[in-house]
């Protein structure tokens, strides 16, 4: 690959080797004025990932190519310092999506070479690609559109036939997986932590604001902090841009509908998911909500366990057989605690009132005695 091309795909083995051969020290990347543009671009791509989209424009010229290439390792340092699993997922997803915008326009030979870097053995013929079904399953597993199911594909001699665009989409998943699995970084050098600290703090603060907005505004009167662990886990994954398994997606959606969230509110939760399709998602939510005449309750705990969706079990879970029962119990406990606190406050106000009244009576009595 030429250097200009490597700048679009800085997570490849070839790009990593190219940067390594430049012989640029960590100290230089962090402090040298020569790489100021690379640092600025690295900060920019992490901030853009926070918003959901890393914008990449065509690069030309040695200086621009170098800045784009070096911005990736600097961005990785920054993400490592943020040290938040959800944010790491969001960053990996944004990088993969940005790569896909270029991958879908590449020629078949380039895509085959690119796939080989990720251990994907494939062939192309007559604008179609074929890949081994094990690779297909590995990278299509997180894609929830029914068209990706193996049962909806032609399997011949262990190979799956797909279009160029579909192959590019699977390569996007390979990119996302590689980046996501490269975190957390085992040991961050002290000089990196020191340099990245102010930028990491800013990104953390912005991400926390996003999470709080997600947790309060979007839910209205619903109390997400009282959700059972399984639903809280599903929401955290959605927020991190992770596609849920169909069974967990149904469980979460039906739960949220039953606790009072609207169809539009739930739709907004999914708009960060990979392959988000507003029309299809809306249809699925409305179907669960009862648009066809059948309303659905979320699965019971036994069913959640059967499908591997029982996550983070706590003490209350031991006494509960249904996610809705968990939420109702939590709401009851919280309301009771609120009533008790209010009762104590009212009792304190009465005691204060009595003390004031007794004080007034004492003053009057003293005046009379005088």
UniProtKB/Swiss-Prot annotation:
GO cellular component terms attached to this protein's record: primosome complex
Cofactor binding: number and manner: Binds 1 [4Fe-4S] cluster.
Keywords: 4Fe-4S, DNA replication, Iron, Iron-sulfur, Metal-binding, Primosome
Gene Ontology molecular function: any one: DNA-directed RNA polymerase activity
Any one GO biological process: DNA replication initiation
Region (Disordered) location: 337-370
Necessary cofactors: [4Fe-4S] cluster
UniProt: [4Fe-4S] cluster binding residues: 230, 301, 310, 317
TM stretches of this protein: none
The family this protein is said to belong to: Belongs to the eukaryotic-type primase large subunit family.
SUBUNIT field: Heterodimer of a small subunit (PriS) and a large subunit (PriL).
Function comment: Regulatory subunit of DNA primase, an RNA polymerase that catalyzes the synthesis of short RNA molecules used as primers for DNA polymerase during DNA replication. Stabilizes and modulates the activity of the small subunit, increasing the rate of DNA synthesis, and conferring RNA synthesis capability. The DNA polymerase activity may enable DNA primase to also catalyze primer extension after primer synthesis. May also play a role in DNA repair.
Record protein name field: DNA primase large subunit PriL
